[in-house]
Amino acid sequence: MLTDMDISRRADLKDIAALGAEFGLLPDEMQLFGKTKAKVDLRVQQRLAEQQGKLIIVTAVTPTPHGEGKTVTTIGLTQSLKALGNKVCACIRQPSMGPVFGVKGGAAGGGYAQVVPMQELNLHLTGDIHAVSSAHNLGAAAIASRLYHETRLGKAEFELQSGQNYLDIAPNGIRWHRVVDHNDRCLREIEVGLGENNGPAYTSGFDITAASELMAILALSRNLADMRARIGKLVLAVNRQGAAISAEDLGVAGAMTALMADAVKPTLMQTLNGAPCLIHAGPFANIAHGNSSVIADDIALKLADFVVTEGGFGSDMGFEKFCNIKARQSGLAPSTAVLVTTLKALKANSGLTSDADINAPDQARLEAGFANLNWHINNVARYGIPVVVAINRFATDTDAELNWLIEAVSGTAAFGCELSETFSQGEAGALALAQTVMRACEQPSEFTLLYPDDMALEAKLSTLAEVGYGAAGVSLSEAAKLQLQELSALGYAHLPVCMAKTPLSISHDPQLKGVPQGFIVPVRELVLNAGAGFITALVGNVMTMPGLGLVPGYLKIDIGADGEITGLG
């Protein structure tokens, strides 16, 4: 079989302007970037008032190093729905260069279920992530500069010379890190302001851009005005009295928003069979809320009969945050969920680690790992929507094990179960899955959130841990206990919680496989994201700046004299 890159290069692409017109966009609603991609102007939101489509959210079992094929299934299902004569659109996140050059690789799908050209999607796209980085770092430069000048001049002289209010920033009161779109562990904790005339020194650090609150704001905003208002609420620092200093207080919110004026527009590309795909925003699902943008979904639902999107990692991560953060804030309600699994994933979740063992038939291990799939089925079903299991088939899978798994799923809360072979067969590989999903979308459902807005903040943490993960409870560090009191006293207890934890286990501990029980979720820190509209709970050892592994992905990537990039897929 050809490589992903070769398949992408051989694709018969539609001119993006023609594809956009078929999708229902007017010429002045598209800002073209050559013939392969276009920004979609938000005026289409006003022109089309009603959402007409069914929203399908794709999630997965607990992820493993072997890859479950969630994006492959998202794109493949989109292609199959189109092949059945439906007007359909996929909505996915923009890939971060951290995973592209790290361990995961690209995020365009794979095989014959791809968004193309895949190299353009995986590297830069239309520059949205760079715009987020630039806007974020402008905020960091602005608050550091303000601290420098206020310290240098004092209150009276500062106000006299600048005409601005003295913010009285507390020593070590700056909360706003800098960001970069790479995995770079040495930047996690740094000292800034060192040296003469460089400002008061303070401890800071870098996060990956996907963890920036600005990225979450981009993904959750309804329009440009909403994004501007949210950016104004960003908490950059605290003053000596402990009060928050916002981007609006600093006077930098407008400039930060201006840097993201084009980033607020989704990017239109296409699948291998010419279905439209909107790519927008890129928050990670382990350290952020892990879903593409509200704006992209809104536009797609106004133009398509079916919209297929995905949440990052397993249903305890991106799907949970789709429901309790994205859907809560936007009012979007999915019609059905597709839960991706593989024989390999179930065996890995039983405790097997070697490729040889996982690829070999092993009925006992498959049955042991099935508990993880059943947990995820029940986890999705508790939100009140039908769940369809998609078994992503690999060449090493045996018919006997696949048939056993299909039969086992029939005894669960799942609406249906189908094989998916879109990686090798493209649109033909998920026709049965597409038909089952269409039937599921017609079922009566009552989408339900896990907890109400007015639940106490500590109770939200307990509910997420005990109901959302099956934990025995939550423990808060001394710092988290103080932060809990502060956030409640300041009136932020109504916000939803974004758990930042490992994706490699339903629990907080990546070593606990299958369906862990009896564990306590350790919350070490609570972080207010006032602009994004949620509180992040940092759990266990999760990091907001990843590091490169022993054998990073960049080792495979190169470019020839002809300009052709190799090694992305």
UniProtKB/Swiss-Prot annotation:
Q: InterPro entries recorded for this chain?
A: Formate_THF_ligase, Formate_THF_ligase_CS, P-loop_NTPase
Q: What is its EC number?
A: 6.3.4.3
Its pathway is:
One-carbon metabolism; tetrahydrofolate interconversion
Cited Pfam families: FTHFS
Q: Which SUPFAM superfamilies match?
A: P-loop containing nucleoside triphosphate hydrolases (SSF52540)
Q: Which UniProt keywords apply?
A: ATP-binding, Ligase, Nucleotide-binding, One-carbon metabolism
- Residues involved in ATP binding: T64, P65, H66, G67, E68, G69, K70, T71
Coiled-coil residue spans: none
Catalysed transformations (reactions) = (6S)-5,6,7,8-tetrahydrofolate + formate + ATP = (6R)-10-formyltetrahydrofolate + ADP + phosphate
Q: What are its GO biological-process terms?
A: tetrahydrofolate interconversion
Under Gene Ontology molecular function, one entry of this record is: ATP binding
Matching entries from Gene3D superfamilies are given as:
Domain 2, N(10)-formyltetrahydrofolate synthetase (3.30.1510.10), Formyltetrahydrofolate synthetase, domain 3 (3.10.410.10), P-loop containing nucleotide triphosphate hydrolases (3.40.50.300)
Which protein family is named in the record?
Belongs to the formate--tetrahydrofolate ligase family.
The record's listing under NCBIfam families reads: PRK13505.1, PRK13506.1
The entry's protein name is Formate--tetrahydrofolate ligase
Q: Tell me which species this is from.
A: Shewanella sp. (strain MR-7)
